[in-house]
């Protein structure tokens, strides 16, 4: 009688070890246990739009983020501020200028250290050349990392995607051919497809700007990004910017009827925070006020926690409260009322106030958790059962 063959076991632990072994050999990332980090934008409400948190949020420090919009909407202004804060956090800046509009003097004016040991500025707008450069640069860092070296923290800025040209586009111009370039979008898509995985492996963020134009073929005309869909697919966060004139009363006849711009930032794609839109201001003389936009959450409902809201002070049994209404804002910790234009100061929005606002704003921008979604489904199912029961109990005479 033949002996029955006993099957050998292959445990989950062995399978996990096999995956680890193959990953080491092929350099494939199987997990990322590092905590998500962010680079401050210097505008609290923009931090929340990008990452939910006003205090510790901002641009993801290991993903692709794109700010897109028409000219003069603050795209470059935003990335200069982000670059400055990245340097403060000890990161090296690789700045790629495709518009030939950035100089070391411009960057210095925004507070950046342009020493070559802290920042490299590259000017090129040919997408194929940039693909080769970035691929070789990232591959060199990967080799160093795989050899056990601790590589510097790097942030790549690309200003802008919309100004990238293809080899064919340039060659057609040299040949005197006035043809539409059908290869440009494909080349840009290749660029992002080639570098995206390496950026993730190295934990390097790319923060880019892009142009937008109106798609008139859509049923309702909408703004879309230049350069095709490649960058859109690769980016984790895409924010569209638009502007209106900012009038402060300081304008003179040479100010083009405005003192700056009111920027509307709309999150078109975000894997971390709910897609929302916020507003902030860029004053040509004073820059941005980082507190602007926080007043939206200073409501009578939040007054007990935050201590700022539009209304008048009330007091009963020694407890300070609020009578909502009016045009002035009552600030509890200062025991004073302010007009809105006086509101946006560190004396009003103290660290204690910001910490009180943090969980309120975080929840507003946060996606629902799995438990919250399940609770909602269960409630809906329960409500359906009650409605069905109520309907069954209706007499036919009640229907007519």
Where would I find each of the regions flagged by the language model?
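Hydrophobic/aromatic beta-strand patches that form the interior of the parallel beta-sheet core
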Residues: 65-67, 94-96, 120-122, 207, ...
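Long, well-ordered amphipathic alpha-helical subdomains in the mid-to-C-terminal portions
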Residues: 290-340
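Terminal-proximal interaction/regulatory segments of ATP-powered molecular machines
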Residues: 320-400
